[in-house]
């Protein structure tokens, strides 16, 4: 099932998004480049929500992401929320893909990094035989015919997106649940800082 998930992600990235009328996804936020616009889209979310403390806390990683943005030689349709839980399965094959509100035009590595980090944040206790990250990356390359590049950068970018969406979502939870959820968020922030330190 997990490899079918990765292979479906590769198929999404092969869609002709221009022919499908999806060019409007290029205009989600202001910025000269594809990934920079996405960085700013999540940052704008913090501004709209009045999350000033969060902006102070993450301004360094945002500045680094903007300054080190790789070129995207093959812009693709990114699902955006490429989380295993957003994929429905029948007979071990993907039958539907849900939750497209975070879709954007960007680098395929952004989607795959988000998917792998999202899976590892859901659980560290997968059954025997579950493909490793390296096996899933190899499966993606085999399905897409593309070579993954700038993996450290896109891992930081994925964690930046995950952390900021969690911060924005925190206020939607009941107060008695927020403390437990905050602990989960702090764990993600620690992963973000570690990935950023390793990539610098």
Model-found features: residue ranges?
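Glycine- and charged-residue-rich phosphate/anionic-cofactor binding loop of Rossmann-like
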Residues: 147-151
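Active-site activation/catalytic loop segments of kinase-like enzymes and analogous catalytic loops
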Residues: 109-145, 158-175
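Start-of-helix signal in alpha-solenoid helical-repeat scaffolds, especially tetratricopeptide repeats
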Residues: 153-156
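Active-site acidic catalytic loop and adjacent metal/ATP-binding pocket
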Residues: 12, 59-110
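Glycine-rich, phosphate-binding/catalytic loops in enzymes
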Residues: 29-30, 96, 113-115
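Protein kinase-like catalytic domain
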Residues: 13-17, 98, 120, 144
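A cross-family kinase active-site recognition segment
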Residues: 1-59, 69-76, 104-105, 178-183, ...
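Regulatory N- and C-terminal appendages and interdomain linkers associated
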Residues: 185-200
């Amino acid at each position: 099932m997990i490899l079918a998930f990765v292979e479906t992600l590769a198929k999404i990235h092969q869609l002709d998004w221009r022919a499908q009328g999806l060019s409007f996804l290029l205009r989600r936020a202001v910025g000269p480049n594809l990934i920079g616009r996405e960085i700013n889209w999540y940052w704008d979310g913090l501004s709209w929500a009045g999350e000033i403390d969060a902006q102070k806390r993450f301004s360094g990683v945002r500045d680094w992401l903007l300054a080190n943005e790789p070129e995207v030689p093959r812009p693709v349709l990114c699902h955006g929320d490429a989380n295993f839980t957003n994929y429905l399965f029948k007979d071990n094959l993907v039958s539907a893909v849900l939750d497209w509100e975070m879709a954007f035009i960007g680098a395929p590595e952004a989607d795959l990094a988000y998917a792998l980090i999202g899976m590892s944040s859901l659980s560290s206790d997968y059954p025997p035989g579950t493909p490793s990250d390296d096996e899933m990356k190899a499966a993606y390359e085999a399905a897409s015919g593309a070579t993954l590049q700038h993996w450290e950068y896109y891992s930081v970018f994925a964690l930046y997106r995950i952390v900021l969406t969690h911060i924005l979502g925190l206020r939607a939870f009941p107060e008695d649940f927020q403390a437990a959820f905050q602990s989960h968020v702090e764990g993600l922030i620690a992963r973000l800082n570690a990935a950023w330190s390793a990539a610098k």
